[in-house]
Curated annotation (Swiss-Prot):
The keyword Cell membrane does not apply. Residues 224-227 are annotated as: Aspartate. This is Probable aspartate--tRNA ligase, cytoplasmic. It is an enzyme of class 6 (ligase). ATP binds at R246, A247, E248, R254, Y255, L256, E396, G444, L445, E446, R447.
């Protein structure tokens, strides 16, 4: 078979996505997974899938002088299992009638030869047709099975072949790219901070501990202190895309034990409102570019999970913490001016702001001192901080603030939070030698995507999610 295949002259190896009617009559070579196959006795039909694209391939049962497959080859092709990875050489033929069930609807490939590069086991953990069916297709075909999400996660490599999953991680990649691009275009330098630390970065108890050469170390729950030290070191604008670790036994649909942090820190030239405006402009740029560059992926996801286009403005809608408390009190929600918002109150605020301002994203600033970490700049007289959260579709997607840059104030606030200054020695020492005013934010990538699409399960946006119940695969 290999020898005969090599004698079939083709016009190069082609991606399925690049096949179109202009190749009518030309011989090509394509590779992909066997998504579907059927045999009517006289004909074999195979739907070949590569990434998010599919094409129908067909061959006729051979007769003497047919010039196609031999009878042994025809019999062998009929036995190829679903999800096997194969190469097909054949002639592109333009079709007069639309081919349903394929992304390439006006062409098919008439098979002249093939080879199996990797055979798939007959016993698949789930049928790809079941996880590839859109909401509309499910309504029309009630025989399609619902595959439990934990089974999909247990077999994540195969699940990544599903169109919705593939499109999701294409969009996730786009968000990281646009985040990095915007910051680099605005003078930011990328840094990589240590994820092995000697003590808590924020005084919390939710840390993973590891053995580190006969002593205890911890997995970083934030790059916060290192970002600030980079600014103190003279790098005016820095950012990081890196993993963050939180040992929280919380709702696995909302929190991950390991997630990707999009962090940035910058010097402040005027006041902290400049940082708020900059972050909002960055998010607007990301949202604009997603619509412009990832329209196909967004529509693929929409076919499986309906979501509304995001509503936002060029300039941010900014409300103070006190103003937001007043809005909630008017809605009958009981809370005080010193209280932080929980997930329910954030959701309520999201609907109120959408009704009042017609946007899905807004900023809450000036949180009470009691609700923020020790490194947050304070206005002691007013009892508030120069801090801010961004709320997207009723969910917090980032938290940030102007930071404390005066050494004696920082030591005082550390002690007030019940943290020993000696445990933060390297961080605190750096502020002894002068520090510019600075601020920034930390964005949870998976949380941002969850809010953007309005989905209920954050694990959908982690390639191999880690939560209190999952350490596999």
């Amino acid at each position: 078979m290999e020898e005969r295949l090599s004698k079939i002259s083709v016009d190069g190896m082609r991606e399925i996505r690049d096949l179109d009617g202009s190749l009518d009559g030309r011989c090509v070579s394509v590779r992909g997974f066997v998504f579907k196959s059927s045999c009517t006795g006289k004909y074999i039909f195979i739907v070949l899938r590569d990434g998010g694209c599919t094409v129908q391939c067909m061959c006729e049962k051979p007769t003497d002088g047919s010039g196609g497959l031999t009878m042994p080859e025809f019999s062998s092709l009929r036995k190829v299992t679903h999800e096997s990875y194969i190469e097909i050489r054949g002639r592109v033929v333009k079709q007069g009638m639309e081919i349903s069930g394929c992304s390439k609807k006006d062409i098919e490939v008439r098979i002249l030869g093939f080879r199996v590069l990797s055979i798939a086991d007959k016993s698949l953990p789930f049928a790809m047709k079941d996880v590839s069916a859109t909401a509309e297709e499910r309504e029309k075909n009630p025989t399609l099975q619902n595959v439990a999400y934990h089974i999909r996660l247990d077999n994540r490599a195969m699940d990544l072949r599903a169109p919705q999953t593939r499109a999701t991680f294409r969009v996730v990649d786009g968000v990281m790219f646009f985040f990095r691009t915007y910051l680099r275009q605005n003078g930011f330098m990328e840094i990589k901070t240590s994820k092995l630390i000697g003590s808590s970065s924020e005084g919390g108890a939710n840390l993973f501990s590891v053995d580190y050469f006969k002593r205890k170390a911890f997995m970083a729950q934030s790059p916060q202190l290192y970002k600030q030290m980079a600014i103190v070191g003279g790098f005016k604008r820095v950012y990081e895309i890196g993993h963050v670790y939180r040992a929280e036994e919380s709702n696995i649909n909302r929190y991950l034990s390991e997630f990707v942090g999009l962090d940035m820190e910058m010097e402040i030239c005027t006041d902290y409102n400049d940082v708020i405006r900059f972050i909002h402009s960055m998010l607007v740029s990301i949202f604009d570019n997603l619509k412009k560059e990832y329209g196909e992926e967004l529509e693929t996801i929409r076919a499986f999970h309906a979501f509304e286009d995001l509503k936002y403005r060029r300039d941010p809608v900014v409300l103070t913490h006190r103003e937001c408390v007043d809005l909630l009190l008017n809605e009958g929600v009981e809370m005080g001016y010193e209280d932080d918002f929980n997930s329910e109150s954030e959701k309520k605020l999201g609907s109120v702001v959408r009704r009042m301002h017609g946007v899905d994203i807004f900023v809450i600033k000036d949180y009470p001192i009691s609700t923020r970490p020790f490194y947050t700049y304070r206005d002691e007289e007013k009892g508030i901080t120069r801090s801010y959260d961004f709320i997207l579709r009723g969910q917090e997607i980032l938290s940030g603030a102007q930071r404390v840059s005066i050494y004696k104030d920082l030591v005082k606030y550390v002690e007030e939070h019940g943290i020993s200054p000696s445990s933060l020695g390297g961080y605190l020492e750096s502020f002894k030698y002068g520090a510019p005013p600075h601020g920034g934010c930390g964005i949870g990538l998976e949380r941002l995507m969850k809010a953007y699409f309005g989905m209920g399960d954050i694990r959908c946006f982690s390639l191999f999610p880690r939560d209190p119940n999952r350490l596999y695969p």
